[in-house]
Amino acid sequence: MNSFLEYTICNRGTNAYSPKAGYHHLDQAFPGPFHTGHASDSYNADGRLYVGGSNQPPTAAAQHQHQNGIYAHHQHQNQTGMGLTYGGTGTTSYGTQACANSDYAQHQYFINPEQDGMYYHSSGFSTSNASPHYGSMAGAYCGAQGAVPAAPYQHHGCEGQDHQRAYSQGTYADLSASQGTEKDTDQPPPGKTFDWMKVKRNPPKTGKVAEYGLGPQNTIRTNFTTKQLTELEKEFHFSKYLTRARRVEIAATLELNETQVKIWFQNRRMKQKKREKEGLAPASSTSSKDLEDQSDHSTSTSPEASPSPDS
């Protein structure tokens, strides 16, 4: 890559060519061999620029043509590489040089201000060591004013800008896509389950049976005594449904809680319905008969009315 630094300036005469890559057909606008009689600059064997008069030795012309051939070869190699980037940190732009043909001057385009060492150069001559010397050799790049018409170069400058704009847009799109993928990798997947999600939020209670029967599901079955069962059967014989006041009274008498009395009456009603459905027990006739017998017994035991004096 160091060979590009030795061929930065090729000609200053009328047959100067565009330093932009890919525009070798510009020589068609200026046909003819290389002019050595009117050129004021020449090359020696080591490729350095010497400013002299019109009396140029024939060996310099041969060396000049040889250097041009080598430059064309290197220029072709530069075209085959796709988007070569050079790590130079020079910030001098060729477009700021004071010359008549501004489109003829070389340009460098920065892709991203955050990336210090990456920028796109139209002609491939980008290095930090050579950037301070471009200000003093502005005339060598631009050429003499009026020597080369600016019309053929304006069209190519537009093409270079369009190509550079498309290249910059593609680079920005790639950078934004890569940044988007990095952000996506940092975020956890939405369907991931954590350990704290697997823990049961409402574990079963392990305390004692609370009052009113609000206990755990594995509540121990209540074992009623014979006295408690007898009193509950008597109460069920008189009334299948209890009021709240009567339920509290029976629970206090039998040393039970209100919920236990309520559940016993519910189970007893379900058993009674099952018996009536199977036909083992009369439906409600027995209960009605019992009520009638009790009413008759109460009336018979009541004292008779005293006879009237008229009878």
UniProtKB/Swiss-Prot annotation:
Keywords: Developmental protein, DNA-binding, Homeobox, Nucleus, Transcription, Transcription regulation. Residues 298-311 have a biased composition (Low complexity). SUPFAM superfamilies: Homeodomain-like. GO terms for molecular function: DNA-binding transcription factor activity, RNA polymerase II-specific; RNA polymerase II cis-regulatory region sequence-specific DNA binding; sequence-specific DNA binding. One of its GO terms (biological process) is rhombomere 4 development. Residues 267-311 are annotated as: Disordered. It is found in: Nucleus. Signal peptide: none annotated. Residues 217-276 bind DNA. Transmembrane segments: none annotated. GO terms for cellular component: nucleus. It comes from the Eukaryota. InterPro entries: HD (IPR001356), HD_metazoa (IPR020479), Homeobox_CS (IPR017970), Homeodomain-like_sf (IPR009057), HXA1/B1/D1 (IPR046327). Belongs to the Antp homeobox family. Labial subfamily. Sequence-specific transcription factor which is part of a developmental regulatory system that provides cells with specific positional identities on the anterior-posterior axis. This is Homeobox protein Hox-B1a. It comes from Danio rerio. The gene is hoxb1a.
